[in-house]
């Protein structure tokens, strides 16, 4: 049962902690909730409450994720923290927890480590737009020059993956001290600095309803005397009666006009993001539209067949493949509402991909799909999910 009423007075932003194992992601998450709860209200969470992350399923993949919330003076944040590295990989690739920005936690005592690099790369591949750095465990480093060196390394690493290293806020602190109630510059003050960086460096995300209209086609009906009705859930934007729309994907792009919007058998003058609607199309035949296409604002999205992506391949225990796959593997790619066959090209020097791996791939589909960078997909074999992925870059 929900505890207390959710006050939607402050704008809402989704964030999460990323970084190498044992650099203090979960301790920092606990410290943020504790310090901000004392300043702005909300619930303080202890390390153990966050570490015991519940299992959840996203696209058939089991992921352990802890969700906490906290408030700053200006905003309400939903924050995700994952216990294990594999959970991060799955979470970011499936988009189970979309992040408007990430807090990269890096230990000042160790400097950047392999997963620090991998999480920055993943953030770039899956389209996390902003990263803020929390240099943790600064209480364990007495040498100011060493701190400067670690900070330089982190900035170089961010630059390498196309994040603005020089402009990125880097906060020095100690999550452990903050948890212990230390009011000094590395304790509570560092957490308040981090909160300020979240408020100022991460812009408010565009609300789904403000985007360009897009609705994946789920079903198509023909209603005698009225024409063709397409049903689906509006993903973003607003559709008004009388507006021109395009049908994109699989076949050649067609133009049509929305002559009616229905919801729960009632006629509306518009449908918006989140609504399950039926859209009546003027002059469009039933056979001109099929599941897997999208209705969209003209010119807002194009069909593509060739792209690079980042994928996670399910392990045998997760119900995935039992054997590796090789170059030119041809599974089905499930985009929004339909499967399209495609061929996978592995990166140079990569012989094969084992179940449980994540890898960057290049894909050529046999039919075009309405696609943008950041679009999620599942990889299937005979209707069974064997992987999950995200479009990193469109080639053609």
From Swiss-Prot:
Question: Which intervals of the chain are annotated as region G4?
Answer: 136-139
Extract the InterPro entries matched here. EF-Tu_GTP-bd, EF-Tu_GTPase, EFTu-like_2, EFTU_2, G_TR_CS, P-loop_NTPase, Small_GTP-bd, T_Tr_GTP-bd_dom
Region G5: start-end pairs: 174-176
EC number(s) of the enzyme? 3.6.5.3
Q: Which residues bind GTP?
A: 19-26, 81-85, 136-139
Q: Segment G2: which positions? A: 60-64
Q: What chemistry does it catalyse, as a reaction equation?
A: GTP + H2O = GDP + phosphate + H(+)
User: What Pfam family is a match for this entry?
Assistant: GTP_EFTU
Q: What is its main location?
A: cytoplasm
Compartment list: Cytoplasm
Keywords tagged on the record: Cytoplasm, Elongation factor, GTP-binding, Hydrolase, Magnesium, Metal-binding, Nucleotide-binding, Protein biosynthesis
Boundaries of every tr-type G domain copy? 10-206
MF terms in GO: GTP binding; GTPase activity; guanosine tetraphosphate binding; translation elongation factor activity
Q: Does the keyword Membrane apply?
A: no
Residues given in the record as Mg(2+) binding sites: 26
Provide a GO CC annotation, any one: cytosol
Tell me which domain of life the UniProt entry assigns to the organism this sequence originates from. Bacteria
The region called G1 is annotated at: 19-26
Region G3, residue ranges:
81-84
Q: Which family does it belong to?
A: Belongs to the TRAFAC class translation factor GTPase superfamily. Classic translation factor GTPase family. EF-Tu/EF-1A subfamily.
NCBIfam families according to UniProt: EF-Tu, PRK00049.1, PRK12735.1, PRK12736.1, small_GTP
Q: How does it assemble?
A: Monomer.
> What's the protein here called?
Elongation factor Tu
Q: Which organism is it from?
A: Polaromonas sp. (strain JS666 / ATCC BAA-500)
